[in-house]
A protein has these predicted regions:
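Single conserved hydrophobic/aromatic residue that forms the stacking wall/gate
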Residues: 1-7, 11
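A structural signal for small-residue-enriched, beta-sheet-centric alpha/beta enzyme cores
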Residues: 12-152, 157-160, 165-169, 175-179
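Short, amphipathic C-terminal "tail helix"
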Residues: 171-202
Length: 205
């Protein structure tokens, strides 16, 4: 029974990865050398309100961030924008490229470590470590007065691991947000994407 469940999961995962590959290939065939990627439509309203960007236009990578980077690079894409909720993207800050909870889930541990690194007071460190959700941990960070300092450091780590996976084959930018606090952090060149994407949305492929 455990073997059968594992095999079914592998089949489902492979089907999802094949779907991502088809979407990427279709986009590349239209002549685009850049692609916007998101784990899903979580944050759809935030992206529309903040940037005027419709997440429905992006390729949905589900939990397979690493596989998506590999496929995009192999196809010849030069640039990628990854947008996502902290619940998914904070895992990338620990080098986790498959963000499904059955693979790894150290969201709170990573946030606690980053808070400690940024000098957050011990009483807040304990609150963060005791949090049940990333939103709860963010509330403790906000109260500590170091939320955005910690988020900027988290984004540094996310970009480090994205670049490590890409191996210089494509440039990756990232925006991370939460339901309650909106935009948490973004990479240096992420803002420049939205002029490009707005032009594309005016003439959808």
């Amino acid at each position: 029974e455990p073997y059968r469940r594992q095999r079914q999961m592998c089949i489902r995962d492979r089907a999802l990865i094949d779907t991502i590959r088809v979407e990427l290939r279709q986009r590349y065939s239209f002549g685009y050398d850049y692609v916007a990627v998101a784990p899903g439509n979580y944050g759809l309203d935030f992206m529309k309100e903040s940037y005027g960007y419709d997440l429905d236009m992006s390729v949905k990578c589900s939990n397979f961030i690493g596989e998506t980077i590999d496929m995009a690079a192999d196809m010849g894409f030069k640039r990628m924008l990854l947008t996502g909720h902290i619940g998914k993207l904070i895992k990338v800050a620990g080098g986790i490229m498959n963000t499904h909870s059955r693979e790894a889930d150290c969201r709170i541990e990573l946030l606690t470590a980053f808070a400690f690194k940024c000098g957050v007071a011990p009483e807040y460190i304990k609150c963060i470590m005791d949090s049940l959700t990333t939103e709860e941990a963010l509330a403790a960070l906000k109260e500590s007065g170091r939320l955005y300092e910690v988020m900027d450091y988290a984004m540094e780590r996310i970009c480090f691991y994205l670049d490590k996976r890409a191996k210089g084959r494509l440039e990756i930018d990232c925006i991370m947000y939460s339901n309650e606090f909106g935009e948490l952090a973004k990479s240096r060149k992420a803002e420049k994407w939205f002029t490009l994407l707005a032009q594309e949305q005016a003439q959808p492929i």
